[in-house]
Structure formats: structure tokens, C-alpha cells
């Protein structure tokens, strides 16, 4: 679950303190005593890349839409009242940064910045170099501990007391940093590279799966098909809609296609730019972050197949801002006729699955990623 700090500046101070204290204390008190010059230079190179990528992740703007942006045809037209412009696909308004962010992944408290389209490569490189640096240090520290243990019968004056103290402190601390950053890196790679999704979009997929499991998703998708593709509505497609609504079991793959998943390699190119420059500290994505290439499933192959049309809906496919009949908050009042008289009944309230209130298995809401739900 995302961390929320009482004083935001701590988000920069804590990582900076850890990078400096672990990196330079380990070098001065431990590595200088036994490590070769070549390995020391490699270690300091990793430290430099950590600082540089962290600086770029903090100060590189994530990207925001121009005020004259116009959504493409067959895309949701979502207007941000605060930025006074339309949001491009995959964009959200960050409550902390007070701006719409292109391809918003999340607001990161440890950079005091949103992770978005323009600075995602810097964020990933920062995680990468932290993992490389802490892994290298873990190997060096383990080697030193093993050497001291093997020669434990040697006179104590052969070892500096400060070295033993810092070995005791820095070894578990470095291992903890390596573990936590590795978990975050794996999550980012799994979402963005292997599935093509931001953390917000992965959260959306979990929410859609819940709606589908409760049989609440399909009616919204069909209404959205009539809204986005009105020219494809005919008796044949309507009969398919009725048949689908009567079908008891439908998998999520039959209802939802995530349009931006192009495969791991193409996802990486779209996010990080040209492969030879992935580790170059100043490289970034090649496009503008306003429009994104979509996969083949997003193209209508058979206009007479409702299943194909549903998979071509823009993301998220269950948007209800334009609908009156199907919304997140429906009335509990029901009017029916009994023996020629109109009777008002109060229906049993259903469990609310509002997009702004829903929580995933990690206990995360849309607001936890930094999104301003009031303008969603």
C-alpha cells in the first residue's frame, strides 16, 4: 500500500540519507580495507548512477497535456475542470502535483513527483542502479564477513573496530534495501513491461474482474458499445447482446481487452525508447504521450460480432460518465404496477462498487495512487 508522509520533504531526505550513509560509510570503513581499486571504481560508478537517476526521477516533469488537446474519435472525452482541458488516454489528474499527468503510474512520495510518461525511464533506471549497487555491496560485504570468519583466530588488532561495527549495521540494512527495491522493480516490470499497464491500469483490471464476477460489467459494456459505435447497432447485434446477457458464464478475457499491451519487447520500447539507450541516463520515450499504439484486438474485424466490438471499447471500457441509465449510483426506488395501481418499493441496496471507493486485494484505492477522484 502506498506510503503517505506527514512531511513530504522526508520522501527525499530518507532515501538520500540511506544512499549516502550506506554507500559512503561502507566504502570508507569497510571496502577500502580489502577491495581492489578496479572494484572500488565500479562501486563508485554505481553510486554515481544512483544519484544521477534519482535526481532525474525527482526533477523531470512526468508530462502534462496541452490545453488545446482534443480526444480522437471513439475515445472517451474526459474534461478536467481543474486543468481546463481534455485528458488524453491513460492520463489522470494528480491531487498532489495539481495537474493532469500523461500515462500516470502513481505519485511517488520518495521522489515527491508523479511517475508518468516522461520520467518513467528515469524511475526504472533508479530502481535498476539501486539493485545493481546493493547487490554489488552485498557480495563485497559477504566476502569480507567470510574472510573474517575464516581468520577468526587471528589477533584482533588486525581488524579495525569501526569495520566490524559497520559490517554489523550495514549488512542487514543493505539486504533490506535490496529486497524492498527488488520487489518494487518486479512489480513495475510485471505491470508495465510484461502487461503494458501502469499501476493504476492494473488496479482497474482487478476492479473490472470484480465487476465481471458479480455480473455487473456486461450491461455497462453493451451500453457503451451503443454510445461509442452507434452506427454498428442493428437487430443482429442487439440479438447477440440479449444472448450474452442471458449467458451465465463469461470470462474476463471475453469481455475486456487491455488495448495498450503490445508484448513485452514492444512495451519496453514504447516506455523506455531505443533499446541501446535504455541504460543511458538521459534517454526517454520517443512519442508525445498523448496517443498510444494499440494491439490487434482493439481493431474491429467483424462489425457484426458484438464480442469483437466489446473488445474494441476505449480504456477503461466501463466508463459511465456519459450514461444516465447505467451509473455507479443507481436509485433504490422502484415503481411497479400491481392490479392497475402504481406501487413504490424500496429495493435492497446493493453493495457499492464505485470506482472512487473500490479497494483491491492490497487495500489500495484509486486515491492511494495520487489520483484526484473528484475530477475523474
UniProtKB/Swiss-Prot annotation:
TM region(s), chain numbering: 12-32, 41-61, 123-143, 164-184
Catalyzed chemical reaction(s): L-cysteinyl-[protein] + hexadecanoyl-CoA = S-hexadecanoyl-L-cysteinyl-[protein] + CoA
Catalytic residues as annotated in Swiss-Prot or TrEMBL: 108 (s-palmitoyl cysteine intermediate)
Domain DHHC: from-to ranges: 78-128
A GO molecular function held by the record: protein-cysteine S-palmitoyltransferase activity
Localization, UniProt: Endoplasmic reticulum membrane
Residues exposed to the Cytoplasmic side: 1-11, 62-122, 185-376
Pfam family, one: DHHC
Subcellular location, principal: endoplasmic reticulum
Topology of this chain in the membrane: Multi-pass membrane protein
Enzyme Commission code(s) on record: 2.3.1.225
Annotated keywords: Acyltransferase, Endoplasmic reticulum, Lipoprotein, Membrane, Palmitate, Transferase, Transmembrane, Transmembrane helix
InterPro entries the record matches: Palmitoyltrfase_DHHC (IPR001594), PFA4 (IPR033682), PFA4/ZDH16/20/ERF2-like (IPR039859)
GO cellular component terms given for this protein: endoplasmic reticulum membrane
Family (UniProt): Belongs to the DHHC palmitoyltransferase family. PFA4 subfamily.
Domain notes: The DHHC domain is required for palmitoyltransferase activity.
HAMAP family: DHHC_PAT_PFA4
Descriptive protein name: Palmitoyltransferase PFA4
UniProt organism field: Candida glabrata (strain ATCC 2001 / BCRC 20586 / JCM 3761 / NBRC 0622 / NRRL Y-65 / CBS 138) (Yeast)
